[in-house]
Amino acid sequence: MLAALKTNLNDIHHVTVMNRRVRVLASHLAAQITGGGSVLDVGCGDGSIAQAILAQNGALAFRGVDVFLRPRVAIPAQVYDGATLPFSDGAFDWITIVDVLHHTDHPGRVLAECLRVARRGVVVKDHLRDGLAAETTLRFMDWVGNRGHDVRLPYNYLSTPDWRALFARIGARATRWTTDLGLYPAPFSLLFDRGLHFVATIEKA
């Protein structure tokens, strides 16, 4: 019964969320990546978000890395170990990392490694454990979106003060920050948007 429920939820999630999510996220990310240059997408998945950003800014050149490489990826991509990016310091102008950090045990280490490789900045999309029942809501969203897809689910969500403290700890700062993303259509937005997500540009302090 649980398996059937999960299958039904996956179908609903794909129809109502995924296509819109790619389009909306690409718009927010593209707005924070100014000009052209090289971009490394960390945790690139199937490359659909990078592809959607390219449709808005053809002056960018994307490459992807992930701990598990899918059979089809829309951008050139390679496997990495999830800890050390196989590139020299400042190898890329930008890094994008979308809904990856909360799947790691040490998000500060992962973000610091991204900052090492990025010349201009790291554009992060992740969650905020802010507000009523935020933890429960985020866990449910992660379970629906990722369970059964070989994705680690440590549910490592941070609040806004936690993120600010993390940035300070690794010698970084947020130069742009937005929580008004509009990822979900009504009525789902009332439960699943409500300040639970952010996109930010992180630079070395």
Regions found by a protein language model. Give the residues of each.
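A conserved beta-strand element that flanks and buttresses the S-adenosyl-L-methionine
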Residues: T96
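C-terminal alpha-helical "lid/dimerization" subdomain adjacent to the S-adenosyl-L-methionine
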Residues: Q51, H127-S189
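A short, conserved alpha-helix within the catalytic core of class I
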Residues: T104-E113
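Conserved beta-strand signature within the Rossmann-like core of class I S-adenosyl-L-methionine
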Residues: R120-H127
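Short catalytic micro-motifs in class I SAM-dependent methyltransferases
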Residues: D99-V100
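Class I SAM-dependent methyltransferase SAM/SAH-binding core
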Residues: D46-T84
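Class I SAM-dependent methyltransferase Rossmann-like catalytic core
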Residues: M1-S27
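Conserved class I S-adenosyl-L-methionine
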Residues: G36-G45
